[in-house]
Amino acid sequence: MSVISESNSTQRNWDLDKDIGLQTYKLILEALTNAPSKQNLPFYKVHLITDRNLIEKIHANTYGYYDAQGIVRPNDQVLANLLIAFEAYEEDNIKFYSDMDEDQYNNIVRRDQRMAVGIASGYVNLIAHQNGLKTGYCACYLDEHVKALLKTDNEIISLLGVGYPDTSKHKDDSHVGDYKYTPQPGKKIQVVHK
């Protein structure tokens, strides 16, 4: 299996005794700050979180996932060695859409923010897997609580856990507790050649 195809599988448990290392951390930071975006504008801020206490507080606010027994559980993907939070951001020079009303402007900027976050997080995902790490995306969190923990009023677009897998467990086993996440079937992307 190639690193690319392997990188589409999420990790839910982590080996916290290992350290990502400064070189890989810097590579992830470079990807986050240099990924392409519309008009090369900064549509997001990133929070690079290694503070275990803060990561666990965020984890406590990620309820929204149901395990195989139908019990709501926190999302263990955020318990990785490094947690990245993507915060919506608008710099003054983003406001070049001056001919739009507020609703049109908000729709365009939100689209561009999400596209930029998708590209940047994709870069991180691939870099992580190329360096022996795994990743886990999270979008099921209590927004107001996570914003308060990160001390921001801006929307948190997505969370991305990056770290070493716990090789003593299956990737769908919980990091904390003894439950198993419901595995999802692989996606099938239709490709049209012309």
PLM feature segments, named:
Residues 41-44, 130-134, 157:
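Short secondary-structure junction motifs
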Residues 32-33, 84, 104-147:
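Small-aliphatic-rich amphipathic alpha-helix that forms the alpha element of a beta-alpha
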Residues 78-79, 95, 168-173:
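Short, charged, surface-exposed secondary-structure boundary motifs
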Residues 2-21, 157-194:
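C-terminal helix-cap and adjacent tail motif
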